[in-house]
């Protein structure tokens, strides 16, 4: 790892790199932009949340208030500008107030939960995956009380995306499913992924037209899968470079999908038809 953040200009295909703190590799893992254009990232090896100002290159560090929380993992902003994040090995979920720099942490009830992907629903409630268990969970944004939702025993959820009407889609990394969770009723549905039980579904997103997209990282080459919630039909295509494990992906407002091909040093884009 190079201890840098990278910026891609989609119009030119040019990259610009921003070096982070000197010395120990901070292990930048998840990142998200705020409304002012700052880039916030989880220093998975450094035990802090970082903020990069791309205009100046300045990096501000917000250290974790607990030594146990040494591996912040995935981050997301809610509508109020609060940054929520998972701490995988530390088994916690946290929130950071950018105005004050204050960080609050809450331990997940199951000590082997391995909190992973996290997203915010339309009501402002963070929902996250427990990769180490067969559970999803939500955290009350005011009290930080955690509610868990049990999934079938074989399931290990890794990442998630949420529809406009708050249906949670998640990738079942262990047993090869695309799943849905209704957090109001607790109802769960599983759809076998086209690549089979060892397809290791991973990164996932939902485009503005309601289509669900995710990657299968256990097949070679990696695939991109489209799921239509209305017809419940799948479409599937290989990633030309092989993918090298697509750990995350994001949909833009105009329907493009950017994928991080972590093992082949590439960023890919899927254009709408």
Question: Residue spans of the language-model regions?
Answer:
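A short loop-to-beta-strand structural motif that recurs across blades of beta-propeller domains
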Residues: 3-7, 47-51, 91-95, 135-138, ...
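Tandem repeat domain/solenoid detector
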Residues: 14, 36-38, 58, 66, ...
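Beta-rich, blade/repeat-based domains predominating
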Residues: 23-36, 67-80, 110-123, 129, ...
